[in-house]
Structures are given as structure tokens and as C-alpha cells.
């Protein structure tokens, strides 16, 4: 069912998404959709089960112009993560909480999407 869903999503994108540049798939496991441009409706396009959207940035500002509070984790490849993090902080972007390598977006730790999970999921009982 997931393979059919991915193929259906690819066909729908080919029909309706003017920003679509190309699509690649070697098997039904992974579909890669390359975008020509980043658009303001970027967060409405979500891949599932091995359906990925890709875009090669020319500069940070290109991404920053479409970032909203709905962004949480940005996966990247071939960039200096520290420089990118500094640029995110300098631009005062609300929405990018984690910058991780491709393949690490679902790794969870004590801090997740800008939240200290231990603190937020803990309860303190105090007796006076």
C-alpha cells in the first residue's frame, strides 16, 4: 500500500506542482523529487514512507524566506552545520530547532525540536 501511495503522490505532484524539476526512483523504496524553487506552500508537501523532496540551496536566505514556525528539523548534506546554525540564530528564525545530517531526522534525544523532554515530561511533587 505504501508503494502505491508513493507512486500516486508522485503522479499528483507531476500534475499540480509547478516547482517540480525531476523525480528519481530506483525501486519502490525511495522516491526523490527535486524542486526547481522553494515556494511558500512548502510545508503542505510532505513525503511519507520513502518519498523525499530535495532542493539544492544557492544561499541560506533562499531557505530562510520560506521558513515558518511549522519547521522543526532541517536535514542537510554537504554544508557546514555550525555555520548554518549561526545563520539561523542570526536571522532569528522561529521554526528551525534542529539541524541534522540526512538520515538522522528521526533520531531522538533529551532535546527534541527545541524542547527539553526530561523537564517537560517530569513532574515535581513538593510537600511543605
List the predicted regions and their residue ranges.
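NAD(P)-dependent aldehyde/semialdehyde dehydrogenase
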Residues: 1-72, 85-94, 99-126
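A C-terminal functional module that forms or caps the active site or interfaces directly
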Residues: 78
